[in-house]
UniProtKB/Swiss-Prot annotation:
A motif (Phosphodegron) lies at residues 423-427. A motif (Q motif) lies at residues 341-369. The gene is glh-1. This is ATP-dependent RNA helicase glh-1. Belongs to the DEAD box helicase family. DDX4/VASA subfamily.
Amino acid sequence: MSDGWSDSESAAKAKTGFGSGGGFGGGNNGGSGFGGGKNGGTGFGGGNTGGSGFGGGNTGGSGFGGGKTGGSGFGGGNTCGSGFGGGSTGGSPYGGASSGFGGSTATSGFGSGEKSSAFGGSGGFGGSATGFGSGGGSFGGGNSGFGEGGHGGGERNNNCFNCQQPGHRSSDCPEPRKEREPRVCYNCQQPGHTSRECTEERKPREGRTGGFGGGAGFGNNGGNDGFGGDGGFGGGEERGPMKCFNCKGEGHRSAECPEPPRGCFNCGEQGHRSNECPNPAKPREGVEGEGPKATYVPVEDNMEDVFNMQKISEGLMFNKFFDAEVKLTSSEKTVGIKPCKTFAEANLTETMQKNVAHAGYSKTTPIQQYALPLVHQGYDIMACAQTGSGKTAAFLLPIMTRLIDDNNLNTAGEGGCYPRCIILTPTRELADQIYNEGRKFAYQTMMEIKPVYGGLAVGYNKGQIEKGATIIVGTVGRIKHFCEEGTIKLDKCRFFVLDEADRMIDAMGFGTDIETIVNYDSMPRKENRQTLMFSATFPDSVQEAARAFLRENYVMIAIDKIGAANKCVLQEFERCERSEKKDKLLELLGIDIDSYTTEKSAEVYTKKTMVFVSQRAMADTLASILSSAQVPAITIHGAREQRERSEALRQFRNGSKPVLIATAVAERGLDIKGVDHVINYDMPDNIDDYIHRIGRTGRVGNSGRATSFISEDCSLLSELVGVLADAQQIVPDWMQGAAGGNYGASGFGSSVPTQVPQDEEGW
C-alpha cells in the first residue's frame, strides 16, 4: 500500500496516527506521541527538553528512560543514540543499526521506513512477514497480538479445537474426532501422566501476568525477555508459589491435601459438589450473583390472533383418542360420574360456549369427558392422558365456569391480587400458552387471567397483577417471589393446578418450592381447596409423592396406559454414531451434504420441524449449519433471553422459521399448529421425556412423524421397544435384539452390552 503507516511520505504529511504528529510513532514539531516529537517533542515517558520519547526525537532525543541529551534508551536519538533498536551509531540490540525503534532516519524504524518493514509496513507492525504480535500479518490478529496475556494482545481464537469452525466447542463438534498428539506432563515434559500425577519435583512456574505485551513480550522470541517481557509493558511479578485450593497451604494441590475436603458451596456439607447438591439452591450474595434484571415487556396479540394462533383442526386420526380405555380409581368405592359427550353437557356459560366454538373445539376428548364433570363436582384429580388430547381445556373450562357461576372473581374493590386459582407450569412458554388459552375462554366475561413468569420485567409483571387477577398462571420461582413480598395474596385461593405435574414434583427444586407455596400460612389447606394434576406421564414414584398434595378421596383418571405414546405419531429410528448425526439431519431435511444447498421445492420450507438436542451450544451450532444451507432455522433454550425465546416461538408458529432447534424448555406442553416432524438429534435421559418430545406433533388427531437418532450406548432401547408395542407400531428387528441386552448380529456388528450414558428453568 502506498499509504501504509510506515510510509515516509505519508508520515511527514500526517498530523495524527501511528508514526505521525501527535501519534503513536512521534510527531513533526513539538508533537507528543507514543514515539516522541521531532523537535522538543515529548513521547511516552518523554522529558522536558530535547524530547525523550518512546521512540526518541530527531535531535538530542532519548528513548524510554533515556537522558535529556544524547541519552540512550528505548529508541534513542540521532546522535549517540542507542536503545530499543539502536540509533545510527549506537549499536543494534533490537533490529540492527540504523533501524531504531522510531529510529533516526527515514530508512526504517518505529513509524517510518520502507513499506516492507517498520511499524505498520506491509508485513504489519514491525515489518517482515508478520507484525507486532501478529498471528498472521496483522496488528493483534489471530491467536496472539497486542495486549493479550501470554501472546501480546488481540482477540482470542474461540474456534472449535477439532474442526476450527466457530460457534461451538470441540466437545460439541459434529465432525469426526481428529487424532491428537500424545500429551505430556506439564511439569517434566514426559508422556504417560499428567502434572498432578508427576513424581518429579514441582518446577516453579514462570510469571505470566502483567500489562502491555503480556508474558511473551514485545519483540521477544519466545522467552520472557523483550519489551514487556515477564509481565508486559510496565512489568509484572513472577507468579507466587502454588497454593492448595482446599486449605490454601503451599506446596501441594487440593487433590493431595491432607486436610478434610471443603464442603458443598451450597449447603456446606461434605461428600458432594454444589452441582450435585440435593438441597434447594441458595441465592448468591452480591451483585455478581443476581444477574441482569429482566426488562422484557411482551406485546399482547389481539384476541382474533389468539383464537387463530392455536386453533388446530381435528385430524383424520382424531377418533383414535376414543379407542383408548378409560380407568377411574379412587379411595371411594364408587364415583358417581356421567361423562359429558359434548361441550353442551359441560354446564358452561353461554359466553364460554361461544368462545369454545370460536376456538375450534367441537367434540370432547376422553380426558375432557371425565375431567369436566369431576372438577365441577369438587374432586381432587390426578389425570394422565396422551399428548395433544386437550388436557388444558379439561381443567380450565370447569374452573372458570364454577368461578363465574359463583361470581367469585378478584375485583378492583378488593385492593390487590387475590387469585382464586393458581396454575403452575415447568416452563415460561407453557405458562404463556395456557394464559392465551385462558384468554380465549374468558373473552367477553368479567374474569381476568394473568401470566407470572421469569424473564418478564418484574415491575411490569407486578403492575399487571396488582390490578387484580382471578386466575394466575406461571412458573414456580416468580409466583413464589410475589407471594413472599405480599403482591400475591393466597387467602382466597380455591383451585391449585399443577400442569406437567410429574415434572413439577420430580424435578429438583420444583418440589420444594411447591411445598413452600402450599404451606404458606395464607394458603388454604388441601381440605379447603381443590388440587388438580395433569400430565401425559405419571411414574409410580411421582404418583406416591403427589398424594401428599391431594385429599384422600382424589380420583385418578388414566386414559389408555399411563405413559403411553400418542398413537397418531409414526415413530422412526436411525442407527448412527455421534459423528454421523449431522449428515443424517441434513439428509432428513433435504439438504445436499456435499454442496450445502437445498431445492426450493423441499418440504423443509413448507412443513414445520422441531429438532431436540441436549446442549445449548449444539442448538446454536446446528442452527448456524442449517442457515448456511439457506434453511431458515432458529433456536430456543435456557441461555436465551425471554425476548429472544418468545420471538423464536412466534417465528416458528407463523412459519417464517420452519425449523426450531430446542432443548428441554420446549419438550413439554407446547401446542404448535402444523408441526409435522420431530427429530431427536440427541436422545433424552428418560423415556417420559421421549414421550413428551414426540408429542409436539400428532396433535388433535393429526398425523405426525418422529425420527430419533440412536447410538450404540443408548440406555432407552428396551423401554422404546415397549413404547412402540403399546402404540401398535412395528418394532425393528435390531431394536428387539438390543432390548434383550446385546446388540448381536442385527445390531452394530458385535455383541455389546447396553451402556447407560452419564448424566433445564429458573424464574
